[in-house]
Amino acid sequence: EGIKGVENQRKHYVDICNIVQGDVSAEVIATDYEGMIKEGEELAALNPHIVVKVPCIAEGIKAVKYFSGKGIRTNCTLVFSAGQALLAAKAGATYVSPFVGRLDDICEDGIALVAKIVEMYRYYGYTTQVLAASIRHTAHIMQCIEVGADVATCPLSAIKGLLNHPLTDSGLKKFLEDYKCVNG
């Protein structure tokens, strides 16, 4: 947020890669095949942890196929159907990102889509990982775990929500009260 200019964005990606020990998705902005290839190769060259994030459109699927052939890992994003997820996997995507919250926003079941994709990949033996995106709350995280999503991108508030439980709070309060009674 607040990072302007391509060079500053790319420096920011490298900074993130130096902090986290895992994959970092970096999104292409181009929507044409040639532009996606150019941007994706530049992004992939920044750091081995970079995964090139490509939109799930016809040109994006072609780009995923190209990147897969070059050993460049990809995240096919803006996935809203099992058909899109199938094409991404067939093209060799490393990750596919179904958008849970955005589907829920239009009265479709985002978690059901994640479950359908997980089941389809297992049935057909695809190695593409399901990266649940557009997670809005703690229940989404737990539901994604229950249906077998491999990864989820989550807001910090939802992650913190995993710690919250009223019995933990009341139990801790009781422990501390008991401790004070015994130890003054």
For every predicted segment, state its role.
Residues 35-39, 63, 81-91, 136-151:
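Catalytic cores of alpha/beta
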Residues 27-31, 55-59, 79-81, 100-101, ...:
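Active-site beta-loop-alpha junctions enriched in small/polar residues
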Residues 22-28, 50-54, 72-77, 96-98, ...:
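Hydrophobic faces of well-ordered beta-strands that scaffold small-molecule active sites
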Residues 121-184:
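C-terminal alpha-helical cap/extension of soluble enzyme domains
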Residues 1-66, 70, 100:
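Active-site beta->alpha loop and helix N-cap motifs at the rims of alpha/beta catalytic domains
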Residues 77-131:
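A contiguous pocket-lining binding segment that forms or flanks enzyme active sites
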Residues 9-24, 61-74, 110-130, 173-184:
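Alpha-helix-loop-beta-strand connector modules within alpha/beta enzyme cores
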Residues 1, 78, 94-106, 147-168:
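Glycine-rich phosphate-binding active-site loops on the catalytic face of alpha/beta enzymes
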